[in-house]
Amino acid sequence: MKKSDFHYDLPEELIAQAPLAERAASRLLVVPPTPAAFSDRQVRDLPELLQPGDLLIFNDTRVIPARLFGQKASGGRVEILIERLLGGQQARAQIGASKSPKAGSVIALDAGGQAEVLGRDGEFYLLRFDIPAPLEHWLLDAGRLPLPPYIRREPGLDDRERYQTVFAREVGAVAAPTAGLHFDEALLARLRERGVEFGHVTLHVGAGTFQPVRVDALDKHVMHTEWLNVGAALVEQVRRTRARGGRVIAVGTTVVRSLESAWRKTDDAPHGELQSFAGETQIFILPGYRIRSVDAMVTNFHLPESTLLMMVSAFAGCDRIFAAYAHAIAQRYRFFSYGDAMLLWSREWGIGNGES
């Protein structure tokens, strides 16, 4: 399977550059699990599309203002994108500069203080910050929000709120779990009234999510790593949902990535079952991989040739996904992080119950 198999042409004007005034006003393309016709709805219609006893699972990671600017001792300008906070005033980061900084060099930060380059960690750099407050708190004032590169404007004050889900609580992401951006408090209240339950995982979306696939042969692609936590309470929620015949719906590809990373085969469950897990994942989901943990997902429209497009193609089938994308383009849906969404049902009904 090749990267080029996942190419599609997207008119540039369909790339959303800003969010709508209301989160839940985004359009929602409903893609049924059979060749039935697509349905054009809005995200605010979800209470009508889900059933009492269903379980929506959100990613509760919180985006940090992870972009910094500074200057090397030589005078050269530097851009820093923090990929992960490591504790002890240290971080792993991407650095953009005319020449790669060497271990031991110091970057004077525009916001005050400095960062020492400790060395390399693969494609990233390890930095130690000399600043007047804990790094996590200092970034709230000093850092800039790292909007995706296809949003061709500087981040504004509104982005501090809108590029964050209303349920974000665990600090550590450098990009938003964008499917969750469509949910506001009013919609969550209506879903609760409908009898839909909520669960949460944490996956800290890393800077690797912005990196393109650089090889055409997908078996040569090295997937980036991200930290996640699937807790025992969520595992029990999923078990209860299955027992009562409810459906499990992931809000975003990061939730699917988390659940599939925590899916384990056991003697009692030869097809696998969800187990609690906290740690790193490097899982790469593409057609041929069978997603068993969820029945449906709410997800945005993804970039051509991206690993996220490959994941949703594994879930719903390549032909179905590309037909849905063609429909969305023809109907002028808005694409990517601030764009519209899909409600995507699995092509294999019942797989979440561990059926073979």
UniProtKB/Swiss-Prot annotation:
UniProt-listed Enzyme Commission number(s): 2.4.99.17
Example GO molecular function: S-adenosylmethionine:tRNA ribosyltransferase-isomerase activity
Catalytic reactions of this protein: 7-aminomethyl-7-carbaguanosine(34) in tRNA + S-adenosyl-L-methionine = epoxyqueuosine(34) in tRNA + adenine + L-methionine + 2 H(+)
Pathway info: tRNA modification; tRNA-queuosine biosynthesis
Disulfide bond residue pairs: none
GO CC annotation, single: cytoplasm
InterPro entries for the chain: QueA, QueA_dom1, QueA_dom2, QueA_sf
Gene3D superfamilies: QueA-like (3.40.1780.10)
HAMAP family named among the record's database cross-references: QueA
General function of this protein: Transfers and isomerizes the ribose moiety from AdoMet to the 7-aminomethyl group of 7-deazaguanine (preQ1-tRNA) to give epoxyqueuosine (oQ-tRNA).
Assembly: Monomer.
PANTHER family, sorted: S-ADENOSYLMETHIONINE:TRNA RIBOSYLTRANSFERASE-ISOMERASE
Record protein name field: S-adenosylmethionine:tRNA ribosyltransferase-isomerase
Species the sequence originates in: Xanthomonas campestris pv. campestris (strain ATCC 33913 / DSM 3586 / NCPPB 528 / LMG 568 / P 25)
Lineage of the organism: Bacteria, Pseudomonadati, Pseudomonadota, Gammaproteobacteria, Lysobacterales
